Amino acid sequence: MRLASTDLASRPPISLSRRRESPSPTSVDVLVPTLKGLSSEFVEHLRNRIPVHCVLTSSAIGPARARQELIGRVDTDWFAFVDDDVKLRPDWWSTVAGMIGPDVGGVEGLWSYLAGDKRVDDYARAMARLSTLLHQESWRDRIDRAFTGDTLVRTKAIKNIRVPDIPVWEDEYIRRWVEKNGYRWLRTPNVVCDHLRTYNLKPSYNVGRYGYYLGKLTVRTQLKRLAQLPIKVLFSLAYTGDIAAATFAIDKDVNIFKGTLQAYVQRNSGSPLYSLAQP
């Protein structure tokens, strides 16, 4: 539906023509994967936050298929991925667009679960505090992966992309493609978006499995996370008093480890999924 509105290890050098490009788009297509359609309130919200050229939607099953279909319909030099379960804060556009540069291919808005799932926000806050006390970023509750639920992308940076039909990590695949084409993928330093849904733990098994296929997770790193889990849970309980946050952390990390372990055990099976590590 269209709603009109008034090799990874090395990057190619930045061309002279790229340096001369205007850094700030005047209007962008907004891509929304959705199975339920968009309310008029949500469309109005998008128009209040973004200089919209067109709002494009796709009801294709699976996030990867939906994003691939939408990318093929983009008419603008830049476009925004916005999921239908987020709310952009008033400074979203000024922050994201303000980070555009000639070598930037994507700017991801940092998001919060505070409005949608308090247990997730409580645990994230506790881990941020713990990492500060220990002076170790590895204690933060974050796997380094892209999120395209509120992201501005340079269309040229994803030229000829073919997103594999995977249930998770399609965001990371898109980021890798952008970086393979010689552009940087940035994340805003401050929260500019709110997730309005409850965190779904069911896909966490596939987060581990496909994260291993993509080369982002290893059994060793996930064993380390499991070893840290008792300390994380106890600190979270002491810091927030939220038992739900502690049980969430246990379920999530155990499921991710199980998925990673399964992928590790099957690594010699010749699964074509391992080709995902090389976009």
Q: What positions do the PLM features span?
A:
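Glycine-rich, basic loop-to-helix element that forms the pyrophosphate-binding segment
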Residues: S58-V74
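Acidic donor-binding loop at a coil-to-helix junction in glycosyltransferase catalytic cores
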Residues: T148, V168-R176
